[in-house]
Amino acid sequence: MEYDLNENTFFVKELFSPKLIKLGYYNYYILEKAGLSHKQILKRIPKDSLFCGIKDKNATTTQWFCTKQDIEEINEENLKITYKGQSNEKIWIGKHKENSFSVLIKLNSSENDKLFKLKRELVGNYFGEQRFDARVEKFYELQQKGEYEAALKYFLTAKSKFDSENSTKIKQLIKEKWGAWKEISRSEIIPEAKKELFHFLEKKENYKEAFMFVEKKSLKQMLKAIQAKRFNDTLEQLMIAKNCKGLRATKALPRKIMITPTEFEKKFGLRKMERKTFFKAKKFRLKTTNKEDEYWTHFALPTGCYATIYLKFLKESLL
């Protein structure tokens, strides 16, 4: 089984049917995007926009969002936004029941026969790789060791693919001048909102407490990703203990795993994270194309489950 996920071979659609009215508190829109990240979308719509979930960049996706504001519809090649109505209820993460997926795959004749036998199998409900920023692993390692100075420095200076030219300059300055807090805070390229952190460090070099002065949204996203990693690690240990092969799960697993936030995470508003340990695909079917050994596979997964994990399970099970 072979596949290459991109906007022409990977399609995702939220299965969500909100009850809409003519006049309500929130405006509801359908967003269709191709090859665009969630961060790219956020630059085009109001900041108060709410989603059921974040959709993959390497796909063509259809999803709902709501906002209190009126916005113009968009009809571009890789982005469409269409007004659908209003509601007094807002959208939240996980409000929809399922996501449907269509993926272009290649199968040989023996794999084709085996594939349908797998559709009823239970699959380990891991978070997919796209859930994790490349910096998560290192930051988690430093935090676990209690190396808060190194963790703070890494958080403030580690490069990201989303960095602007100005962000790159700021990170470079902080890295080069680390410890010279007064000099950093006086730099013209440091935004006023960031200077509070360096004023604090100038008076009190408590690196753990200093995290209270970093950009909260970015830190919270990082800590949530760390919680997801802890879930994956816990699930992997349970799967090994139950002699699960690869991603194939068993009902012998506890139905859910609860990840309790650390005292550090609680300071930034993180709560307990509860997630099911396995899932089963629904509505599985194959459709032939006009090319030999090429098929469209269609399936639906519960909210929060990753198609990339399911595809990986199918591929490894066919080996």
Indicate residue ranges for each PLM-predicted region.
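Extended, charged/glycine-rich binding lobes that contact polyanionic ligands
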Residues: 1-302, 308-319
